[in-house]
């Protein structure tokens, strides 16, 4: 695809994972072109054409013995597992790039995972403002700020919090000890066509010896351009019901669905049914 930049990895592939502990990792992928990224697990490749087969009981989507089963979030790339067996596994992550719903490129990254016994509890971090939510949708030109909290069951350990500077122009300040809080702030760009996703990752790491424990999570902000216009045809006279309203969406071009309330109409245009107010929800079928 002409004029396409490949996704970039900002996090080192994980090496060691603790037996019996819930663990989340993210490669910290950024895309210079702002393309939409979709993640999946695939077979590792021996060369450009041949994949490496797994032994019985294992597969590309089940490379590590884990309860619940190892999983990858297809939207943000978070890999989650709770290993139940000391072993070594290989994960291959395929990242596909989409631009306006069209596949423009892909890249694969392998990582080797060693599951071992640990005498240390991994640190953890919250979602946005202490919740479990790590995704937000905002309009262009909007200021968004939120906190991310860290924690560690081993209360005597010192936890550090870092981010990968994944969003240009954003700030991330860390304060507090031994379990710091990170504050993220950013004003979204005003020139956004359709929906563009901006992502960053945050890593929390303790000071356990001889090997520190860590986890990495992704945070994703979708910037979605608003509806361009609403075309109205006024009623011809007082008491008439011959007016209409039409939703006009031209940025970006695409296929949309419509849901009006009250009334339940699903057309782009509705005719006046009498006095009152109407609300319309517009959904881009390509991005949801």
Stretches with model-predicted labels:
Residues 45-69, 74-80, 166-185, 258-273:
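Surface-exposed, flexible coil segments in extracellular/virion-facing regions
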Residues 23, 31-45, 154-163, 249-259:
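Solvent-exposed loop segments of extracellular immunoglobulin-like
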Residues 88-99, 196-207:
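A short beta-strand micro-motif common to beta-rich folds, especially ectodomain repeats
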Residues 81-85, 180, 187-197, 267-284:
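Solvent-exposed segments in extracellular or luminal domains encompassing
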Residues 123-126, 222-288:
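Proline- and Ser/Thr-rich low-complexity, intrinsically disordered segments
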Residues 1-34, 102-153, 212-233:
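Extracellular interdomain linkers/hinges and stalk-like, low-complexity segments
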Residues 96-104, 205-212, 283-288:
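Short, solvent-exposed loop/turn segments at the edges of extracellular beta-sandwich modules
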Residues 22, 86-90, 143, 181, ...:
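Extracellular Ig-like/FN3 beta-sandwich strand-entry sites
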């Amino acid at each position: 695809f002409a004029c396409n930049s490949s996704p970039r990895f900002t996090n080192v592939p994980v090496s060691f994972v603790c037996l019996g502990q819930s663990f989340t990792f993210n490669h910290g992928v950024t895309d210079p072109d702002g393309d939409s990224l979709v993640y999946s697990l695939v077979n590792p490749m021996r060369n450009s054409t041949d994949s490496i087969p797994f032994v019985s009981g294992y597969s590309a989507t089940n490379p590590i013995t884990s309860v619940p089963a190892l999983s990858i979030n297809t939207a943000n790339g978070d890999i989650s597992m709770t290993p139940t067996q000391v072993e070594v596994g290989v994960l291959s992550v395929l990242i596909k790039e989409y631009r306006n719903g069209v596949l423009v490129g892909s890249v694969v990254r392998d990582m080797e995972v060693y599951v071992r016994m640990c005498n240390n509890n991994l640190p953890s971090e919250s979602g946005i403002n202490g919740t479990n939510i790590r995704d937000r949708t905002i309009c262009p030109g909007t200021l968004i700020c939120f906190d991310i909290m860290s924690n560690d069951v081993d209360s005597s350990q010192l936890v550090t919090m870092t981010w990968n500077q994944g969003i240009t122009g954003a700030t991330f300040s860390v304060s507090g000890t031994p379990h710091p809080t990170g504050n993220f702030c950013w004003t979204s760009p005003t020139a956004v066509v359709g929906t563009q996703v901006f992502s960053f990752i945050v890593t929390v790491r303790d000071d356990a010896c001889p090997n520190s424990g860590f986890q990495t999570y992704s945070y994703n902000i979708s910037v979605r351009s608003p509806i361009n216009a609403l075309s109205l045809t006024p009623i011809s006279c007082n008491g008439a019901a011959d007016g209409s309203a039409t939703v006009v969406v031209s940025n970006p071009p695409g296929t949309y669905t419509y849901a009006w309330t009250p009334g339940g109409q699903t057309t782009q245009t509705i005719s006046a049914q009498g006095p009152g107010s109407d609300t319309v929800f517009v959904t881009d079928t390509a991005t949801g």
